[in-house]
């Protein structure tokens, strides 16, 4: 049997986000090891990068959450028969359903092996259950493993493999400092941030991210510390109303000089490094918490709720940042303590990108019996 393998990853689109990033990372790792990498999606702005890194992209509209997506079953089956991948790796629910029906009419002996990754703690229903119906189910954290055990007991424990997502520490070097040019541009755009202690809440603008906690914190802390709250992340059209609501709340609380919304940024590394504290205050458990990890890798302290993937990262890398979930008083005390007596995190040793890619490729090879 040949030691090279062909892997086809499927996801809705290739624009931005953790699922997309992970797809590119695995594609890159496959190509680097001499394997063949194919991605099927509806396309997006990351396609040129994907192709530049050696992965072939096949465009198919497998992104719509509607019954019309079932019309893509036959075209996908044709693609699979044409490409003959060893592994089909589904990373989202709509592509998983289309793949499920596409594979059913392929004879067992000609069928590729099916792997899924559960990237999120989806709403619990039959639609989401498809993510647990693969030969191997990758969970991106122990919290996701627990979620699968609890809500999908039919999924054999032996099928579930926990593979943490990881980051490239060369991209997030410890004690990294933004360039003088970056600081100059920052102060030109946002002069109100100069000489301030920056407390940053990164992430897209949604009700789940805990912005209210940030506003209340800044309102209390500004009486004692020279703080400024920074919200890094944009709002899509559907969430624009919530952003307007938050900005009105800032006015109502008289915090215009103490909180800044900087919108979507491509220079997140610089913002995390420039921050004195980064917060992770989602109202629901995070499946992993990549931004928490990126901030810690750079040497920036992170404070977050003691639950979900963020707690797994903080427990290993910065336990001083853990706070009882939804406890506003404990949160204030913790941040007050860290502002009064800063405790920078030690260099991160775990959650490296190479560990994630090596474990995933090893799983592929195990499933197709190459080892």
Segments predicted by a language model, with ranges:
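Short hydrophobic beta-strand element within catalytic cores of glycosyltransferases
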Residues: 39, 301-304
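Glycosyltransferase donor-sugar binding loop
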Residues: 40-45, 202, 228-244
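A conserved, positively charged/aromatic
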Residues: 108-142, 154
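A short helix/loop element that forms part of the nucleotide-sugar donor recognition site in Leloir-type
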Residues: 173-192, 245-247, 342-344
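Conserved acidic donor-binding segment of nucleotide-sugar-dependent glycosyltransferases
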Residues: 316-328, 336-340
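A conserved mid-protein helix/loop that constitutes part of the nucleotide-sugar donor-binding site
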Residues: 17-25, 197, 201-222
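Active-site donor-binding acidic/aromatic loop of nucleotide-activated sugar
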Residues: 238-244, 256-265, 271
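Short His-centered aromatic/hydrophobic patch
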Residues: 90-96, 118
